[in-house]
Regions:
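Conserved catalytic core of the tyrosine transesterase superfamily
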Residues: 1-146
Length: 146
C-alpha cells in the first residue's frame, strides 16, 4: 500500500480490518493494487459511519447496521458524483469484508447482500472508419507468416 490508511473505527474493528487485509493478501492472493483500492474504499465507509453514528464504529455497530445504513452510505457517495464503477467496487468491498466477518465468526450482518450494484452504462466498441479499416488491412498484409 502507498501510504498508511486510517480508519475511523474502534481499535477492535481496526484489528478486524487488518486481519481481513492479511487474508486478502495471503490466502486470496489479491494484488497490492486491489488491496490498496479495497482498503481505501473501506476507509471511506468508516469515515461515513463516523458522521452517520456521530462516533467511531464499533463491533456492535457493524452487526446492527441495516439496509438503510448501507443505502445512506451509497446515497452520500452518489451525492458526491462518484462514478458508478467506483460505487460498484465499494459495494464489492463491503460485501467482501462483511462476508469475511461472518465466515470468521466475528459478527453476522447479511443486510449488505440486499444491496444491488448500480446500473452501469454498457459501452459498445466503436467502429473503425473507412480510412482506419484500409490502414489496418494494409498493415496486416505487410506482416509475414510465422
Amino acid at each position: 500500500m502507498k501510504q498508511e490508511i486510517r480508519y475511523q473505527a474502534s481499535a477492535e474493528v481496526v484489528s478486524f480490518i487488518h486481519r481481513w487485509q492479511n487474508w486478502l493478501k495471503d490466502e486470496r492472493r489479491y494484488s497490492l493494487h486491489t488491496l490498496d483500492a479495497y482498503s481505501r474504499d473501506l476507509s471511506v465507509f468508516f469515515d461515513f459511519l463516523k458522521d452517520y453514528l456521530k462516533r467511531a464504529a464499533e463491533r456492535q455497530d457493524l452487526a446492527s447496521l441495516d439496509v438503510h445504513g448501507f443505502r445512506a452510505f451509497l446515497s452520500a457517495r452518489a451525492a458526491r458524483h462518484i462514478d458508478k464503477n467506483s460505487l460498484a467496487r465499494e459495494i464489492s468491498t463491503l460485501r467482501n469484508f462483511f462476508k469475511w466477518l461472518n465466515r470468521s465468526k466475528i459478527l453476522k450482518n447479511e443486510d449488505i447482500s440486499v444491496i444491488v450494484n448500480p446500473r452501469r452504462p454498457k459501452i459498445l466498441p466503436k467502429a473503425l472508419d473507412v480510412t482506419q479499416t484500409f490502414n489496418l488491412l494494409k498493415k496486416s498484409e505487410k506482416n509475414q507468416n510465422w
